[in-house]
UniProtKB/Swiss-Prot annotation:
It catalyses: IMP + L-aspartate + GTP = N(6)-(1,2-dicarboxyethyl)-AMP + GDP + phosphate + 2 H(+). IMP binds at residues 13-16, 38-41, 131, 145, 223, 238, 302. Pfam families: Adenylsucc_synt (PF00709). It is an enzyme of class 6 (ligase). Pathway: Purine metabolism; AMP biosynthesis via de novo pathway; AMP from IMP: step 1/2. This is Adenylosuccinate synthetase. InterPro entries: Adenylosuccin_syn_GTP-bd (IPR018220), Adenylosuccin_syn_Lys_AS (IPR033128), Adenylosuccinate_synth_dom1 (IPR042109), Adenylosuccinate_synth_dom2 (IPR042110), Adenylosuccinate_synth_dom3 (IPR042111), Adenylosuccinate_synthetase (IPR001114), P-loop_NTPase (IPR027417). It comes from the Eukaryota. One of its GO terms (biological process) is IMP metabolic process. Belongs to the adenylosuccinate synthetase family. Homodimer. Mg(2+) binds at residues 13, 40.
Length: 425
């Protein structure tokens, strides 16, 4: 490879898992760099669907080692629950192929309780629409230097003191909104302390040795660029760096060893929870995209908001992440649309100025109109198509326009849910 990074280019749920599954078949190491068990994707292999939230999907490959990196917030209960689920579906030796960086922070039941309390304090459209799994509060305690790292789980007195201090502070802050039993959590970790030792490693050293020895690494990005804490639609974002920078720092990668950065982009756009979404379609087209695309979350079951592809967002995403290629996913979902729209710019309604960049000011963004380009639909199934030249001319034109507009080649095109439903360019 030797090091390949897969990143979401929109608001998540682009279909990163499918490409990860394909590429991890050749990878020797598959790693997660940031996020927690809030992100989820399904991988279909050998007729079986596997759900991944916290664990890298390289666990499907019997010859691939897997690492949860230092930038991830690790929920220990979710870690073991996910391992059990994979074993129940027939995957063997998964416990021998997964490691956790000792520098990763621990996501606790306490953090989920804080998440619920914080959302309860917000009103109406001010709600972020989090998954409720405490990812934001986990990163908040990390940033405030009060967090608990994985290696501290094994220092019982230190762990309990830090946890009790956190619980007392949040109880003072939220009062009755903070529903949490610290003794119950302490009891659970007495059991986890016995189960975890064989899974914990020095994460930076593991990656350093892997890159120096020339092993093929596949890095699975979680969430997506537009949910990045610095570059996303703040404050309607997650609490970690979800782009290229987060992948590098979350795993201590040697950037000189990175060969490819793949941006995964859905052929239309979806978003979960609150926040701006300029191309959202609240009419028939949006409903049709949601139903045909089966747009509801693996982690939460929530229905996703749907709309047209926004190339302003995509160019902005490319500016931040410097992709070397695109994986265009779910092109087949557009099979039945007579007309397909794509956003190519925004327009200031007062001045008439055409805006070709994605602004930081969300209030200003809300005032802008969307400038669309319309494409003729192909209105024929493409799932069985295996080469680009065999695609309908209208579908080819759609793909070529994305390449020309962004200046980045499309290297993979998803044409269906199965692993084999992929065109390689």
């Amino acid at each position: 490879m030797p090091t390949t990074i897969i990143l979401g280019s929109q608001w998540g749920d682009e279909g990163k898992g499918k490409l990860s599954d394909i590429l991890c078949q050749k990878a020797q190491i598959c790693a997660r760099a940031a996020g927690g068990h809030n992100a989820g994707h399904s991988v279909v292999a050998n007729g079986v669907s596997y759900d991944f939230h916290l664990l890298p999907s390289g666990l499907i490959n019997p010859n691939c080692e897997n690492l949860i990196g230092s930038g991830v917030v690790v929920n220990v209960e979710a870690f073991f629950k996910e391992l059990n689920a994979l074993e129940e579906k027939g995957l063997k030796h998964v416990r021998e192929k997964i490691l956790i960086s000792d520098r990763a922070h621990v996501n606790l039941t306490l953090h989920a309780a804080v998440d619920r309390a914080e959302e309860a304090q917000l009103e109406g459209n001010k709600k972020i629409g989090t998954t409720g799994r405490g990812i934001g509060p986990s990163y908040a305690t990390k940033a405030s230097r009060k967090g608990i790292r994985v290696h501290e789980i094994f220092k019982e007195a230190v762990f309990e003191k830090k946890l009790r201090t956190l619980a007392e502070g949040y109880k003072k802050q939220f009062g009755e909104l903070f529903e949490y039993d610290v003794e119950e959590e302490i009891a659970r970790f007495r059991e986890y302390r016995k189960l975890l030792p064989n899974f914990v490693c020095d994460g930076p050293n593991f990656i350093d040795q892997a890159q120096k020895s020339g092993r093929d690494l596949l890095i699975e990005g979680a969430n997506a660029l537009m949910l990045d804490i610095d570059y996303g639609t703040y404050p309607y974002v997650t609490s970690s760096n979800t782009g290229f920078g987060g992948a590098v720092t979350g795993l201590a990668l040697d950037y000189k060893q990175i060969k490819e950065v793949i941006g995964v982009v859905k052929a239309y756009t979806t978003r979960v929870g609150g926040g701006p979404f300029k191309t959202e379609d609240l009419g028939d087209a949006g409903t049709k995209l949601q139903e045909i695309g089966r747009e509801w979350g693996v982690s939460t079951g929530r229905r996703r908001r749907c709309g047209w592809l926004d190339l302003v967002v995509l160019k902005y995403s490319q500016l931040i992440n410097n992709y070397t290629s695109w994986n265009l996913t779910k092109l087949d979902i557009l099979d039945t649309f007579p007309t397909i729209k794509v956003a190519v710019a925004y327009k200031d309604k007062e001045t008439g100025e055409v805006i070709e960049h994605f602004p930081a000011d969300l209030d200003y963004l809300d005032t802008l109109e969307v400038v669309y380009k319309e494409f003729e639909g192909w209105q024929t199934p493409i799932t069985s198509v295996k080469t680009f030249d065999a695609l309908p001319a209208q579908a080819q034109a759609y793909v070529k326009f994305i390449e020309e507009f962004t200046g980045i080649p499309v290297k993979w095109i998803g044409t269906g849910p199965a692993r084999d439903d992929m065109i390689y360019l």
